[in-house]
Amino acid sequence: MAWFLCMCVFSVVGLGLLLLQVKLRRSLETRGGPPSLPVFPLIGSLLSLRSNQAPHVLFQKLQQKYGHTYSLMMGPHTVILVNHHQHAKEVLLKKGKIFAGRPRTVTTDLLTRDGKDIAFADYGATWRFHRKTVHGALCMFGEGSASIEKIICREALSLCDTLRESGSASLDLSPELTRAVTNVVCSLCFSSSYCRGDPEFEAMLQFSQGIVDTVAKDSLVDIFPWLQVFPNADLRLLKQCVSIRDKLLQKKYEEHKSDYSDHEQRDLLDALLRAKRSAENNNTAEITMETVGLSEDHLLMTVGDIFGAGVETTSTVLKWAIAYLIHHPQVQQRIQEELDSVVGGDRTPQLSDRGSLPYLEATIREVLRIRPVAPLLIPHVAQTDTSIGKFTVRKGARIIINLWSLHHDEKEWKNPEMFDPGRFLNEEGTGLCIPSPSYLPFGAGVRVCLGEALAKMEIFLFLSWILQRLTMTVSPGQPLPSLEGKFGVVLQPVKYKVNATPRAGWEKSHLQTS
């Protein structure tokens, strides 16, 4: 009986505290905070988020009632949704460092060994050092590097040959694109690549998809961490996938350690090893293991970050691009005519051709607009009390930029659901333009995508090589690829099959990489 009375007292007190918290949260709006969705004890605004629509679409729809910027409660957490480019740029650019924090969640902590990576790590000295180190390595081996262009072209040739050899059979494009992009990133990170059917590559595909599927579910355990004491199939699967990934990363790490040389940097992992050794051997106050945090965990998670993000995002953009080209054969034909005119059939496309292929570049930009690979950017956290526009924002509030809303704003884009590469061309159709400031496909500011330049290189070269040699269609009587998308860590197209028909003169692969 006494136990029951104690439970009742604790329940009443707890409920009272929660009601007080809700009252205080609601009062934020009257003190200058953004308009808020309804808030209830314990669950916050979750009842308002029940919908069959994907989150980015629902958040876009809710702005009709609450305005471009509004707030909600995810359990005990204040979340502010930003759906307009002016406020988005204030968060990302004008006040980038103030909003550079990251929230801690159960799933991302499992994925990153408690935030020891770049994408999900909180802002601070350790994060800045890691990002600077990785950016330097990417500049050395990636952006503008002739060696990385050669690697991409090698994989583009292999991909085109695989597609050509499929003959009249329909082919699932997803694993082939993923392997091609994986090999580019593996060459950059590990100086290695994979052949079709390689067991290690197949394991990589499996754990990557498992991570994407589980992290994407916005599990209740991330809102209420105490739920992890109960059996959870998603968490169990995530742990299994992370374990497989970590074994692969550890294997690559040990291989690099065994033959590492200070006189040669072969790849990104070598660059990180050099930075780690410098930190271990440097006794100055400016650089120590404590200040930069370059432990083995940090090193492995940083590489894992680049590997995971670099493969999933770029391959997804390529899948969307080909899906839209199948839907719009006139766009595909115009790109091919542009390639024929500028590149011809006696050589392969090169990065130096980008400025001379405006319609292809415009098409890539339109794909990134209409189907942003990350429709909701990774949440930011306010590190101090601040503001967004006229709205007060309290320290610790989570900010989500709805890139989907920015890219589908009817006031910024004419017929935003229409696929129209021409919107990115000047009036003469001879040069590129950005017709609206509401366009941020790679984010912006302090947390801008590290691999933006590399991704643009890959997308351009893979598409130009494919379209120079092949025409992409579906078999007669087969449905066109769905353009709805599957929401997750990235917005993936539903799997589809293609027919890759060699263009005239390209029945055999007569041009190789130089």
UniProtKB/Swiss-Prot annotation:
Provide the catalytic activity annotation.
a C21-steroid + reduced [NADPH--hemoprotein reductase] + O2 = a 17alpha-hydroxy-C21-steroid + oxidized [NADPH--hemoprotein reductase] + H2O + H(+); 17alpha-hydroxyprogesterone + reduced [NADPH--hemoprotein reductase] + O2 = androst-4-ene-3,17-dione + acetate + oxidized [NADPH--hemoprotein reductase] + H2O + 2 H(+); 17alpha-hydroxypregnenolone + reduced [NADPH--hemoprotein reductase] + O2 = 3beta-hydroxyandrost-5-en-17-one + acetate + oxidized [NADPH--hemoprotein reductase] + H2O + 2 H(+)
Q: Which domain of life is it from?
A: Eukaryota
- Family, as annotated: Belongs to the cytochrome P450 family.
Q: What is the enzyme's main class?
A: oxidoreductase
Q: Output a single Gene Ontology CC term carried by this record.
A: membrane
Q: Which CDD domains match?
A: CYP17A1
GO biological process terms on file: hormone biosynthetic process; progesterone metabolic process; steroid biosynthetic process
Q: Which SUPFAM superfamilies match?
A: Cytochrome P450
State the pathway, as annotated in the record.
Lipid metabolism; steroid biosynthesis
Activity regulation text = Regulated predominantly by intracellular cAMP levels.
Give the record's keywords alphabetically.
Answer: Heme, Iron, Lipid metabolism, Lyase, Membrane, Metal-binding, Monooxygenase, Oxidoreductase, Steroidogenesis
What's one GO MF term for it? heme binding
A Pfam family (short name) is: p450
Q: Which cysteine pairs are joined by S-S bonds?
A: none
Q: Which InterPro entries match?
A: Cyt_P450, Cyt_P450_CS, Cyt_P450_E_grp-I, Cyt_P450_sf
Q: What is its EC number?
A: 1.14.14.19, 1.14.14.32
Q: What does this protein do?
A: Conversion of pregnenolone and progesterone to their 17-alpha-hydroxylated products and subsequently to dehydroepiandrosterone (DHEA) and androstenedione. Catalyzes both the 17-alpha-hydroxylation and the 17,20-lyase reaction.
Positions annotated to bind heme: 449
- Tell where it localizes: Membrane
Q: Which cofactors are reported in the record for this sequence?
A: heme
| Keyword Cell division assigned | no
- Look up and give the organism this protein is from: Oncorhynchus mykiss (Rainbow trout)
Give the protein name, as stated in the record: Steroid 17-alpha-hydroxylase/17,20 lyase
